[in-house]
Every structure is written in structure tokens, then in C-alpha cells.
């Protein structure tokens, strides 16, 4: 139980780090810009994550029945599906989010909402966040909370430390870089872990 709570707390830190760091080390105008872009990327993330709804119970059943062949097949298909949907959705987001924000904030002159570099990094970070879904789902289905809690804690610490270091110099882009590094780390760590302990999946 406590290992699951630790993972949940680390997840909350990953979710709220950007706004807190921007509030402390940057300005409220940066928080305002971040919130507008976050509105779009969160919507796309919810769309991608909905594709994998209900898969944890199926994977858990296959693990419990020790149906290794079916587990590997289902996981491979889920992984391919999520990767494809995430890349397509966030590729479109990278291309269209700035024009959308320009229309959404038309008439606002006190803040420059056109932040193309930030849009690129935050979209890429959220793409990697979605790509880790199959790994996260199969880990939870297998009940490997204790074995994987260090991954969540390290990712949260990476996000905090890198964001603080880079936000002072790069502002909005800095927190997006911190988030991106944290999720890239999680993807690599989780992919390596499940390939060794849960599914037969080359990594």
C-alpha cells in the first residue's frame, strides 16, 4: 500500500511542479501563458489516454493466468497503438497550438502568448508522457509497486531540479525541458524494466 502511495505522491509532484516553479522563480504572466498551452496539451493527453482505458484489467488477467504469449501480443499491440496515436496527436498539436493560441488570446496585449519554442517542448513532453502509458499499465497490472517506486521518485526529483535550474535562464521553456527530461527518463527506465521482468519485449 505504502509503495503505491509513494508513486501517487511522485505523480502529483510531476503534475504540479511546473506551475509552482513558475510562480516562485518566474512571474504570474508566465503562469498565465503556461495555463493556456496546458489547456490544449492536457486535452490531447486525455484523448490519447482514453485509447488505453480498461487495458489494465485485461493485462492483469493475462498475468494472473500466466498466459505469456497472449500477454506479449496484447502488450505489443497496445504499445504500437498508443505510440501511433500519441505521435499523430501531438504532431498536430505542435503544428496547430500556436495558431490556436493566437486566436484564443486575440485582443490580449499585456502578455505575449505566442511562444513557439515552449509549444514545441511542452507538446513533446506530453507526447512522451502518453507513450509511457503501456509500460505504466503493465507494471500496475503486475503489481510491481515496490520494485518501481524509485523510478517515480527519481523522475519527480529530475523534474524539480532541472526545472529550477533552467527556468531562471529560459523561463517557460525551462520548465518544459525539465518535464521532458523526467518523462524521457521514465520511458527508458520502464521499457527496460518490463522487458526484463514482465513481458518478452525487445529493448
What does each of the following model-derived ranges do?
Residues 93-126, 173:
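Interfacial segments at transmembrane-helix termini and the short loops linking adjacent helices
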Residues 41-79, 135-141:
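Helix-loop junctions and terminal segments of transmembrane helices
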Residues 1-16, 54, 58, 63-73, ...:
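Interhelical loop/hinge segments that connect adjacent transmembrane helices in multipass membrane
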Residues 123-154, 194-196:
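Membrane-interface junctions at transmembrane-helix termini in multi-pass inner-membrane proteins
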Residues 67-84, 88-96, 115-119:
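Interfacial transmembrane-helix starts/ends
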Residues 2-3, 18-19, 32-49, 77-84, ...:
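Alpha-helical transmembrane segments of polytopic membrane transporters and translocases
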Residues 22-42, 70, 74, 111-116, ...:
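Interfacial/gating helices of multi-pass transporter permease domains
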Residues 138, 180-203:
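C-terminal transmembrane helix end/exit motif
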Amino acid at each position: 500500500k505504502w509503495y503505491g502511495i509513494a508513486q501517487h505522491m511522485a505523480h502529483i509532484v510531476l503534475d504540479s511542479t511546473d506551475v509552482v516553479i513558475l510562480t516562485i522563480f518566474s512571474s504570474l504572466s508566465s503562469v498565465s501563458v503556461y495555463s493556456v498551452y496546458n489547456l490544449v496539451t492536457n486535452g490531447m493527453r486525455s484523448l490519447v489516454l482514453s485509447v488505453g482505458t480498461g487495458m489494465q484489467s485485461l493485462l492483469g488477467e493475462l498475468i494472473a493466468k500466466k498466459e505469456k504469449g497472449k500477454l506479449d501480443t496484447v502488450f505489443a499491440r497496445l504499445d504500437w497503438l498508443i505510440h501511433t496515436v500519441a505521435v499523430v496527436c501531438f504532431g498536430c498539436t505542435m503544428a496547430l497550438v500556436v495558431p490556436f493560441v493566437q486566436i484564443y488570446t486575440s485582443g490580449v496585449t499585456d502578455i505575449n502568448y505566442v511562444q513557439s519554442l515552449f509549444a514545441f517542448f511542452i507538446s513533446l513532453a506530453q507526447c512522451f508522457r502518453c507513450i509511457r502509458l503501456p509500460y505504466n499499465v503493465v507494471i500496475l497490472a503486475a503489481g510491481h509497486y515496490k520494485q518501481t517506486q524509485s523510478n517515480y521518485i527519481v523522475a519527480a526529483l529530475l523534474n524539480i531540479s532541472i526545472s529550477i535550474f533552467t527556468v531562471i535562464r529560459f523561463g517557460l521553456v525551462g520548465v518544459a525541458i525539465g518535464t521532458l527530461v523526467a518523462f524521457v527518463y521514465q520511458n527508458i527506465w520502464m521499457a527496460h524494466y518490463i522487458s526484463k521482468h514482465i513481458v518478452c519485449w525487445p529493448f
